[in-house]
Design a protein with these regions (language model features):
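A preference for well-ordered globular domain cores
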Residues: 1-83
Length: 83
C-alpha cells in the first residue's frame, strides 16, 4: 500500500470520528422525554440518517483526496463541533 492510500484512509477515519461525534451529540434529541416538537424531532432523525449514510456516499471522494462537507445540521441545534 502506498503512502497516499494510507494517508487517505487516515483521513477517512477522521471523517468517521467526526460523524460519530455528531451522532452522539444528537442522541438526546430523539429521546421520547426530550422537550422538542415532533416536527423538529423528525428533522433530527433525517439529519442523523444523512450522517449515517455520509461515509458510504462519500468514501470514494474522501479516499481520492477530495474535500466533502458534512450534512448541514438543523439550524435549531448547536453541536459545538469544529471540523
Amino acid at each position: 500500500m502506498n503512502n497516499y492510500i494510507i494517508e487517505n484512509k487516515n483521513i477517512l477515519g477522521k471523517y468517521r470520528n467526526v460523524r460519530n461525534e455528531l451522532l452522539n451529540k444528537t442522541d438526546k434529541y430523539i429521546l421520547s422525554d426530550y422537550p422538542i416538537t415532533l416536527e423538529k424531532q423528525m428533522i433530527i432523525k433525517t439529519y442523523r440518517q444523512d450522517l449515517r449514510e455520509f461515509i458510504n456516499n462519500n468514501e470514494i471522494k474522501i479516499l481520492a483526496g477530495d474535500m466533502v462537507e458534512f450534512p448541514q445540521q438543523p439550524d435549531f441545534i448547536n453541536l459545538n463541533i469544529i471540523y
